[in-house]
Amino acid sequence: MSISRREFLGSAAAALAAGAPVESYRPNLLPSQKEVWDWQVWMAKLGPKYTGNPAHVQFVDFLAAQLKSAGLEVARERYTFPRWEARRWELSIAPASEKPFRAPVTSYFPYSGQTPASGVTGELVFAGSNPSFRLDQLHGKIALIDFACNVRKFGEIYEPWGIHPADAAFPTSIRPARGAVNDLTQFQKAGAVGVVLAWTDVSDANAADQYTPFSRPPQNIPGLYVGRETGARLRSLASPLASGGAKATLILEAQTFPDSPTDTLIATLAGASDESIIVNTHTDGTNATEENGGIGIVALARYFSRIPKSERKRTLVFPLTTGHFAGPWVPSIRGVITKYPELIKKTVAAVTVEHLGCREWMDGASFRYRATGENEWSVAITETKSTAQALLEALHGSASRRTAVVNPVHGGWLGEGASLTRAGIPTIGYIPQPNYLLAAPADGCIEKLSAELMYSQIQDFAKTIHILDRIPAIELKKS
């Protein structure tokens, strides 16, 4: 089911979306699409940028250099934390009545635990399906569990301010490929020596390399994921369902780096007044889109730095934070809010930029993972009518098709914009949610992104910031 055009809320926003183009926007001042895409391709080749790893450090240094070269004042905030990094993972099964075999592993549970090079071995026991687990009789054994991905019920939590294009059908729910079990400590406390988590409702190609869940504290028990068919086979061999049972050897070699440094950047472009607009993202992530918001911000910073200060009513502040993938230790945008209360008081609006250029990839009925030929839905979350209207006006004539500007009336704030909203700032949180968001293949999912879409989205943000800059602060806060 989908929300039809007749069900859209905010008729005034729809009228704005049909209005004139943003006159203050100067496309010739924006870095070219080729330049932006070249940055994107370079970034993807770095590999996963898990918080504080060498690729992430290199990316943050690149962003800082680009922002400084555009004339912005760039400050760094350093954090340290115990960085965990997986080195090698493997799962071997020795059934009582079959030949031993190596089970294909789709990925590992981040910050779960680690084993010696020889792994840990124990009887494979099926401990249930999420969320109902049987924790008795797991001592010294390897727990096998399975799960279905959680549904995000857009139709229940969001009310659209408007949709671009207006005749597009915004889905009432999605089920992105995300691990649904966020805590393994219950199995560790029950005495298990390892956990195997089996996907049940996505293809193996979709499940491959998923770094999920992220931002969890150490679990103190190693966990590996297997695909749908492998999970079904293991379940048929595991106790108590199988008469003879099977032994499993789970290997997850990992290393922890205590006191690993990681930096947040705060770049400032002074305007004609002390009032500020925050444009933020995070810099750590798994692939080419998670997180490429920093590339978008570099393009935006270069664009606005080429406009005379006298024509920029407000100061632009660009926090590019670390810690999105290390939440137990590093506060990401919450750290900026806590440390700079005067900035927050002077900020009249915020735009959070995440996950640019996403094209839609879905599992078909036969579990064939493929491109649909459409853009991924971009969900722009905002609680205030003024910010919603600003984005809808910016979207007029945009190539960023399948954008939903929504009011989170029943929750559903996702991403780095949530904390800014809680701090009382009218915020637009732009957050596409593709299946591959947390996947970390060698190519960084670059083939799933569109240079044209990414560039169009950056243009939309530039126009939105222009519009926000001209709206009085008192009007921006009106719901």
Language-model features and meaning:
Residues 7-23:
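N-terminal export signals
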Residues 25-30, 46-54, 168-177, 182-183, ...:
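Second-shell loop/turn segments in exported
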Residues 29-33, 41, 45-162:
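Noncatalytic luminal/extracellular "stalk/propeptide" segments of secretory-pathway proteins
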Residues 67, 277-328, 461:
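Alpha-helical metal-binding/catalytic segments enriched in His/Glu/Asp
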Residues 106-136, 213-291, 299-307:
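Soluble metallo-hydrolase cores and metallopeptidase-like ectodomains found primarily
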Residues 222, 316, 435-479:
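His/Asp/Glu-rich mid-to-C-terminal helical/loop segments that flank catalytic regions of hydrolases
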Residues 272-274, 321-429:
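Metal-dependent peptidase/peptidase-like ectodomains
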Residues 406-458:
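Zn-dependent metallopeptidase/amidohydrolase metal-coordination segment
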